[in-house]
């Protein structure tokens, strides 16, 4: 998944950025509209008490499970804005990912010249005005970062705030729970001495069992994958009385951007989780945009099992680059 998604400000948002210091507005709550632009969802009018105004901001945020960017204007901050990135824990994972990956683009829209400090929140308790002010005051004592360091830090922090903590053993990527049927299928696969195939999918923020097949020859594995939806799969191959386990990740170019982002960001967490919880060690990997790449030769080569007919070639373990436009 790329480190940032480029979205554009709407006319309403651009107008706010031009006029916020000269109009009676305390804060603007910004949402991502149609997954292609930043738009002003709500504006909170300014009163004599910034703390009172922030209570209204908090009420607006807690009334929805949708993540949001909040720009707060404090007259005492030399016309600068305070940025609050709010990603509630119960938000949809796809929305969390979208906001996390677009935060750097949001900062560029506002421009660093207009931003004073930034703050991340994911729970109602973290939206307490006094706690936010305390956190922001600590940031003032830290050395300033270069712009590339700032964007990297912001992205990492926003990704961290979007993590679902259902399985603490997941250590990399976006953590998702694995349902019991998927865990049982993987456990059975580990002890199998046959050519068995387990295919997983992500449904409603949970990694679930899509298909479980027994005695599937390597030449037939590719036929079980979708041409439009991503999938994770584990395939066992008998070897000297035990089995080799191959990890297969197919992410078709036809899949939606959201699905590709979700699968890409949860892959490492899945592998970490099954290793920690089930003791499954992966003996080889095939990752591709096209299930047609999962040939018998590639499977045997990836698993380190020699084939009498295998040619000297390199296993496909990555995704193809988009083809350049044809020259006219």
UniProtKB/Swiss-Prot annotation:
Cite the entry's keywords alphabetically: Actin-binding, Cytoplasm, Cytoskeleton, Phosphoprotein, Repeat
Where can this protein be found? Cytoplasm, Cytoskeleton
Q: Which residues carry this modification: Phosphoserine?
A: 143
Annotated region Disordered: the residues are 302-328
Kindly give the InterPro entries that the UniProt entry links to this protein.
ADF-H, ADF-H/Gelsolin-like_dom_sf, Twinfilin
Extract the Pfam families matched here.
Cofilin_ADF
Q: Does the keyword Transmembrane helix apply?
A: no
What Gene Ontology terms describe where this protein resides (cellular component)?
actin cortical patch; actin filament; cell division site; cell tip; cytoplasm; mating projection tip
Q: Where is the composition biased (Polar residues)?
A: 306-318
> Please, one GO biological process term?
actin filament depolymerization
Query: Molecular function (GO) terms listed?
Result: actin filament binding; actin monomer binding; protein sequestering activity
Q: Where is the ADF-H domain?
A: 1-137, 173-304
Function (record text): Actin-binding protein involved in motile and morphological processes. Inhibits actin polymerization, likely by sequestering G-actin. Prevents actin filament assembly by forming a 1:1 complex with actin monomers, and inhibits the nucleotide exchange reaction of actin monomers.
Describe its assembly.
Interacts with G-actin; ADP-actin form.
**Family (UniProt):** Belongs to the actin-binding proteins ADF family. Twinfilin subfamily.
Q: What is this protein called?
A: Twinfilin
Question: What species is this protein from?
Answer: Schizosaccharomyces pombe (strain 972 / ATCC 24843)
């Amino acid at each position: 998944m790329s480190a940032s998604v480029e979205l554009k400000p709407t006319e309403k948002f651009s107008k706010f950025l031009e006029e916020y210091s000269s109009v009676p507005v305390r804060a603007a709550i910004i949402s991502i509209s149609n997954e292609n632009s930043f738009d002003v969802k709500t504006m909170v009018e300014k009163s004599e008490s910034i703390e009172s105004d922030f209570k209204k901001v908090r009420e607006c945020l807690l009334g929805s499970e949708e993540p949001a960017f909040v720009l707060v204007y404090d007259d005492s901050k030399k016309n600068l804005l305070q940025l609050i990135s709010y990603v509630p824990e119960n938000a949809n994972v796809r929305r969390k990912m979208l906001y996390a990956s677009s935060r750097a683009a949001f900062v560029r829209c506002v421009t660093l010249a207009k931003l004073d400090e930034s703050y991340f929140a994911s729970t109602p308790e973290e939206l307490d005005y006094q706690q936010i002010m305390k956190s922001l005051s600590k940031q003032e004592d830290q050395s300033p970062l270069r712009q590339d360091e700032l964007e990297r830090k912001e992205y990492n922090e926003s990704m961290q705030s979007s993590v679902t903590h259902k399985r603490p053993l997941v250590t990399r990527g976006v953590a998702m729970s694995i349902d019991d049927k998927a865990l049982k299928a993987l456990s059975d696969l580990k002890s199998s001495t046959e050519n068995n195939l387990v295919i997983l999918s992500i449904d409603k923020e949970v990694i679930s069992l899509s298909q479980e097949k027994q005695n599937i020859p390597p030449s037939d594995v590719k036929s079980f994958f979708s041409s439009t939806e991503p999938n994770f799969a584990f395939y066992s191959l008998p070897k000297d009385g035990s089995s080799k386990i191959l990890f297969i990740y197919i992410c078709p170019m036809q899949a939606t951007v959201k699905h590709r982002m979700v699968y890409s960001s949860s892959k490492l967490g899945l592998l970490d989780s099954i290793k920690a919880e089930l003791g499954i060690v992966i003996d080889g990997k095939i990752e591709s945009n096209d299930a047609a790449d999962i040939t018998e030769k590639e499977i045997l080569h990836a698993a380190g099992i020699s084939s009498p007919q295998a040619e000297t070639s390199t296993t496909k373990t990555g995704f193809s680059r988009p083809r350049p436009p044809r020259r006219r």
